[in-house]
Amino acid sequence: MTTPAPIKVDAPDGMRFDLSPEQEMIRQTARDFAEREIMPGARDRDREARFPHDIIAKLGKLGFLGPTVPEEYGGLGLDYIAEAVIFEEIGRADSSIRTTLSVQISLTEMTILHWGTEAQKRKYLPKLASGEWLGCFGLTEPGVGSDASNLTTRAVRDGDEWVINGRKMWISNGGIAKLAIVFAQTDPALKHKGIAAFLVETDTPGFSAPTIHGKLGLRSSNTAELVLEDVRVPAENMLGNIGQGFRIAMSALDDGRFGVASGCVGIIQGCVDASVKYAQERTAFGQPIAGFQLVQELIADMVLDLEAARLLVYRAGYLKNKGVPNTRETSLAKWYASEAAVRAALNAIQVHGGYGYSDEYPVERYLRDAKVATLYEGTTQIQKLIIGRFATGIDAIAPK
């Protein structure tokens, strides 16, 4: 494996480019676990589209299902850089498992931590951080993806309860979650200002989650449709207040994009590792192909993308640790890292030649798994519009 050499230099604003001893320990723990428990069965799980319940349980025992959850709520109380290195190491081994973790941590736990009441935090975070419960994030609908301000799922107040009806689509962890954060419109006349978020326990009558099959990648992760038919949710399970739902969703997506970007760094690292190993072992014309200039060019391009993506992720994590606005930096990291992961996987397949087209080597899986990173948590095009807004001061997609 190619291990990045730490750069012990302070940036002008105090950001450091080397990991702390604690962060290095977390990286090594995650790497050892990934190489021992995740990598050996990744191909078979992908072939069988089999969700790894056993591995998720072991990650829970390590504390890796709640790394950034404060200790008082059952988590490890780590910072965002430590979270990033966990996602990177797990993503290098199997993006399906990294996706499960990202949804659990970035979209579910962090949303409750940032927006929940004290009672909600104490009720749900310990169960999520331990892995006793898995969570999911129900925003996308069959006809609503990037335009999250126009939800069709409805929530109507009935005494001390809200009654929710609607459907959600492409929900990671949806079929295995015990808790869903569901976004619904309380008053269509208010448009995005009428959206609210609800904590829905999935054993509630009227809730179902049929699994979606036939995905290009992330085959051993669970993806489902959420169907809510007269689902009654206690009023105290609203997350935040009416009108805050859209803001909660956008805030959560910042955390989600950070997780995706971190996992994509892992994919790129995996592509570099696999390509260097193969190029050093494969011979042609009487020498290892690693000595050919055009093969080195493919690998060098991957290394450049790896270093750039990792630094963008760490920059976003640094700002998140400081508690300052980071939407711009998180979008930059997600945009660059996801597209770079696709480029790296294509280059890695090219290095491997015909073998790269077979699942005998991991690089074809890296490509299939990388592609979805350019789509979920906001497409590449949405990230460009976000960056364009910061550059020009004009919001091309502001809710009307």
Kindly label every feature range from the protein language model.
Residues 150, 203-234:
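Flexible, small-/acidic-enriched active-site or ligand-binding loops
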Residues 78-79, 147-149, 173-178, 191-194, ...:
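Short glycine/proline-enriched turns and hinge-like loops at secondary-structure junctions
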Residues 160-161, 165-210:
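A short core secondary-structure module
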Residues 1-103, 115-120, 127-132, 145-148, ...:
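Alpha-helical interface subdomain recognition
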Residues 101, 128, 143-146, 170-173, ...:
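Short Gly/Pro-enriched turn/cap motifs at secondary-structure boundaries
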Residues 63, 87-91, 184, 200-205, ...:
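Short Ser/Thr-interspersed hydrophobic loop/turn segments at strand-loop and sheet-helix junctions
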Residues 131-139:
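A short, Trp-centered hydrophobic/proline-enriched beta-strand micro-motif
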Residues 109-115, 137, 149, 189:
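Flexible, glycine-rich active-site loops centered on histidine and acidic residues
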